Amino acid sequence: GDVQRMSAGTGILHSEYNASEAESVHLLQIWILPETTGLEPGYEQTHFTVGDRQGRLRLVGSRDGREGSVTIHQDVNLYAAVLADGDTVTQDFGPGRSLSVQVARGAVHL
């Protein structure tokens, strides 16, 4: 459950690696263009437990950092969920909004 936000802004050096020789790492990178250019480079990381995401959509990224989510420089809301067989979640995204779903394990019906 960690969510990281990295803003390259005017420039940043970055690499991804697994420091553990015993445990595998699973990650999902989502690239979102900022709504303005020339921002200072920045980094933010927040941990969300399984309980935070169990059976519900948990806001993990937003423009204003509400509900403890990481701050994203764009009009976007990112949600994470851990769902069991038969779980149902509902979210009203409002008119004119787009939706993208990433399933890390299992299957969903939309």
At which residue positions do the language-model features occur?
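Glycine- and acidic-residue-biased ligand/ion/polar-headgroup-sensing regions
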Residues: 2-3, 84-110
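Ligand-binding loop in jelly-roll beta-barrel domains
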Residues: 8-38
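Short gly/pro-enriched beta-turn/loop segments at secondary-structure junctions
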Residues: 23-25, 52-55, 71-76, 84-86, ...
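Generic beta-strand structural signal
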Residues: 2-4, 12-14, 26-30, 56-58, ...
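"Short basic amphipathic alpha-helical interaction patches in structured regions
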Residues: 2, 18-19, 44-47
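Conserved short histidine dyad/triad with adjacent acidic residue
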Residues: 6-11, 62-67, 77-95
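A contiguous pocket-lining binding segment that forms or flanks enzyme active sites
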Residues: 28-70
